[in-house]
Structure formats: C-alpha cells, structure tokens
Amino acid sequence: MPPHFLSADSTGQPHRHADRPKRVRTPGEPLRIGVGGPVGSGKTALVAALCRQLRDELSLAVLTNDIYTTEDADFLRRHAVLPDDRIAAVQTGGCPHTAIRDDITANLDAIDDLVAGHDHLDLILVESGGDNLTATFSSGLVDVQIFVVDVAGGDKVPRKGGPGVTFSDLLVINKTDLAPMVGADLDVMRRDSTKVRGERPFVLISLTADPTAGPVLDWVRAQLRVPVQG
C-alpha cells in the first residue's frame, strides 16, 4: 500500500481539523487505538508486540506516521508482524503531531483504505511519529490513546507532565530494565505518575523481560470488550 501524504489547501497551508468532533464508534467499526510518545521510547516495538499477540485472535491493521520516510511501517513488514497489506504509512512532511491532531485527513484516508481492503477489522493501531510530551491524538481520529515514555529519559519524565503523560488513556513507562544503568528510580516514577494522572491507569514494562507486553495487552483486550453504542 503506497504511503499517504499530509495535504495542504490552495494557500499551501495544512487543512485544519482541530475542531473535528469526537469520533463516535458504531457497531461493526474497528476500535482505533493511538500509540504516541517521544522518539525512541519504544512505540514501534510495542505495536509489534501487540500485533504478534493479537493477530491470531482478531482482525487488525496498523497505520504508522513518519516525517519523511516509511521507516516504522517498513520495520513492521520486515518482522512480518502482519501481512503487508495490513500495514499502511503516512508521511507527514512536518511536525508529527500535525497529522494526528491538527490535520488528520491523511490518516483518515489511510484508515478508509485499510477498512475498504478488509471485510472486517476489529482493531487499527495508529502509531504517531516520534514527538515530544505535548503530542496527543485528535479525538476525531482515535477512540483511545496510549502514550509511551521510557526510563532512559530519567525518572523525571512523568512529573514533567504534558498532555500525553497526564491525559492519555494509558501511560506506558517502557524499558524498566534500563533503570539501574541510568540511575532512574522506578518508585519515583510510579509516585509521580499517580500524582499527575490521578485515577488514569499507567503501567511499567520491559519488552526485553516480557516480549508480550502483558499489561498493555490486557488493557487493549479490555478496550475491545467495551460495548459499542448504537
């Protein structure tokens, strides 16, 4: 499937969809889960792990976002986590958050192509390009979102806050196996995550220790069980 590109209007400015209404999922539509977070936090590795665990029990597809390449989609194809036609890519050509929050047209077009190409999809994972702590998905694009940070950034990351850390439906603190090497205190990260997120869930994982991403997998399965209105 060829990559989709972020479009612009006649003035050369990106189309604006920041005010797009929240998506209302209807029966028969796939659940859309956004996976965002900084560069190198482990988003693609997490998506790959989820695909490996879920591909035999449901119908799923993946949509990746990169600025100038299709590197993340290519990685998933090389590792055969799904058939090639179930992996699509958007090339944003600019700040990654633009394509998942401000102008979601290219992502919506790619999702339409995935849905049209498969009789019934249960789940679409939408991975953002690597960005900073301010990146979030438009509620018109995804139903729920995961935000991934990693221990290598230091135990200060959760208390820095930001929309992704604070308001995502699930915060994933990845690469816990690196904590001793970088001097990060996991208890501090747990405390600060609880403080900034309140009752919103978070999990600490290491894909090295648990390649199945067990706690995230459990959360995704729980989202799939939520009744669809309609």
From Swiss-Prot:
Main location: cytoplasm
Chaperone is among the record's keywords: yes
Region called Disordered, residue ranges: 1-31
Subcellular location: Cytoplasm
GO biological process: urea catabolic process
GO cellular component, one term: cytoplasm
SUPFAM superfamilies on file: P-loop containing nucleoside triphosphate hydrolases (SSF52540)
Keywords: Chaperone, Cytoplasm, GTP-binding, Nickel insertion, Nucleotide-binding
Basic residues bias: start-end ranges: 14-25
Binding site for GTP: 37-44
Claim: GTP-binding is one of the keywords in the record: yes
A Gene Ontology molecular function term of the record: GTPase activity
Xref: NCBIfam families: ureG (TIGR00101)
Quaternary state and interactors: Homodimer. UreD, UreF and UreG form a complex that acts as a GTP-hydrolysis-dependent molecular chaperone, activating the urease apoprotein by helping to assemble the nickel containing metallocenter of UreC. The UreE protein probably delivers the nickel.
Annotated family: Belongs to the SIMIBI class G3E GTPase family. UreG subfamily.
Protein name listed in UniProt: Urease accessory protein UreG
Gene responsible for this protein: ureG
